From Swiss-Prot:
Biased composition, class Basic residues, residue ranges: 43-55, 140-171, 203-215
Name of the protein in its database record: Histone H1
Cited PROSITE patterns: H15
UniProt subcellular location: Nucleus; Chromosome
Annotated GO biological process: chromosome condensation; negative regulation of DNA recombination; nucleosome assembly
Top-level division of the source organism's lineage: Eukaryota
Length: 265
């Protein structure tokens, strides 16, 4: 017979669970992004404050140093150029409101203009270069041209109101011009009147000239006809220019007729 072994209940003791310390790792990306956003905000806040506090610059109480230097050199008119001391003295006398470091700034601008070729340095004195002299002469011309244009533009606006008056003056001038024409027309009528008077003596001369040769022809029949006919022709030839001459020439043939009558007696 098989013997049955008693079943012994074995108790299992649970093993202790060793728990390792867990390190919580926070994501690095959000940690970095948050400080950047904060830095940008702080920068913007700092940048906005000086802008609000910035004041507009006061306009300079004097022209640029380049203009002042050119003005000093041109007005001093020194052959060998003007020294720094002479230029500074001239500018100080002309410009009253200058900064405390004026002489230092003047020296810097002199060196700058020499380097750019606008000024020429000769033994410690400064001259204007040929390129710098030309614009200095051209600028006043441009200003005068602009002034002349503005002066011409102003009178151009005024004639609009006087435009109504001008036609009246023109009409008066036309009327005055028309009067001399009428006066010129009158001499023509006078000339026309004188022409008929000149024509009257011609009409008077013609009948006399016709009568005279008839009388002479009678005498020519009695004596030698050949010679007297020639004489009559000469008289007729003389009478042709008498027509163009004035009335005084008409008296001469009357005297000849009287002489011929005496011959008949």
């Amino acid at each position: 017979m098989a013997t049955e072994e008693p079943i012994v209940a074995v108790e299992t003791v649970p093993e202790p669970i060793v728990t390792e310390p867990t390190t919580i790792t926070e994501p690095e990306v959000p940690e970095k992004e948050e400080p950047k956003a904060e830095v940008e905000k702080t920068k913007k806040a700092k940048g906005s404050k000086p802008k609000k506090a910035s004041k507009p610059r006061n306009p300079a109480s004097h022209p640029t140093y380049e203009e002042m230097i050119k003005d000093a050199i041109v007005s001093l008119k020194e052959k060998n150029g003007s020294s720094q001391y002479a230029i500074a003295k001239f500018i100080e006398e002309k410009q009253k409101q200058l900064p405390a470091n004026f002489k230092k700034l003047l020296l810097q601008n002199l060196k700058k203009n020499v380097a750019s070729g606008k000024l020429i340095k000769v033994k410690g004195s400064f001259k204007l270069s040929a390129a710098a002299k030309k614009p200095a002469v051209a600028k006043p011309k441009a200003k005068t041209a602009a002034k002349a244009k503005s002066v011409k533009a102003k009178p151009a606006a005024k004639p609009k109101a006087k435009a109504v008056v001008k036609p009246k003056v023109a009409s008066k001038a036309k009327a005055v011009a028309a009067k001399p024409k009428k006066a010129a027309a009158k001499p023509k009528t006078v000339a026309a009147k004188t022409k008929p008077t000149a024509a009257k003596p011609k009409a008077v001369v013609k009948p006399k000239s016709k009568v005279k040769p008839a009388k002479v022809a009678k005498t020519s029949v009695k004596t030698t006809p050949g010679k007297k006919v020639a004489a009559v022709k000469k008289v007729a030839a003389k009478k042709v220019p008498v027509k163009s001459v004035k009335a005084k020439s008409v008296k001469s043939p009357v005297k000849k007729v009287s002489v011929k009558r005496g011959g008949r007696k």
